[in-house]
């Protein structure tokens, strides 16, 4: 058992999520084509400040994340501060925890408040897969470095003649794990095979996610937490996530072919998240500061946990490790929760984790616990759909989930919710939030 956690300031004040906002999420090279992550981040933070009538000078710290790094803006957090009217003295730094990045930025702001260093802060994350750093081959990079040391034409020629045509080709960002060479999709295929996750079940989960997300949009549930964007060249408004299948039909999913194991695989473009562009942010305050400024919090952070597991097998099983720690720290069980959202990187990964939550064998052999975390009640699970439908701008997903969960809990009259996500590198996050 993990010791109980107290997420309060030294004076016993809770850490409040006062507001949250995100851009619509866009499939790569669509509505946000050509818009870098730093501009997406500035866009959503500025809109959140304006929407909630927050004086930018009140912000004491901003922690923001980005997974697909841009060399020209390595500290996206500081660029957001400088681009949104905050004080030049506002502290800002950037974090990266793969798909759990904005859970990390949220926790960092919370911990600054717990230490008494700040009372108002912003956390979030943004990513653009449409504006990615295109590199050069290692041979060309070395040659370009060597060229700087040459003086004569002959010396330059001797450096360049070692290059082949292949060395001159651009190198796109890596999609595989550095340590294993495996892509996330290959890991999802492995998990599907190892845990007997059928193609039919994966397609059903994807269809469910799209259907619930479409229903949430149609019922107006997301309108208050998704801004209208006007990306360059500013000719049209972008208002809704463009990956959601508003006319999703289960039979349509069966038509797609596997992507990562073309002969025996079950993971397709329809039951996996697409490459996505977008940004999200949350405004956080200590309980007393929110009250003094006249804000009613959306909710509070009750507990959180991070986990790291093996990358060679079941690399995306992290929620099954992080969740029991977060529950212990909150003094809760799975049955105590009102709602659950698990990030859907792949339907296969999500279904494998659902299985392991309910497995005594997994708990005993992998977690060193006597009993399973518990069987998930699907009536509480991803009730508005999740990443399979909305898309997954890596660093933006965590704060998207936090805002969406708190708003839905409030619509239901309050309660507590679990948020959990797997991440590249065998990492994972889990957070429990609560409302009044």
Curated annotation (Swiss-Prot):
Assigned GO CC terms: cytosol
Gene label: fadI
Gene3D superfamilies, per database record: 3.40.47.10
Protein name: 3-ketoacyl-CoA thiolase
Organism name: Pseudoalteromonas atlantica (strain T6c / ATCC BAA-1087)
Gene Ontology molecular function, alphabetical: acetyl-CoA C-acyltransferase activity
Localization, UniProt: Cytoplasm
Active site (catalytic residues): 99 (acyl-thioester intermediate), 392 (proton acceptor), 422 (proton acceptor)
Matching PANTHER family: ACETYL-COA ACYLTRANSFERASE FADA2 (3-KETOACYL-COA THIOLASE) (BETA-KETOTHIOLASE)-RELATED
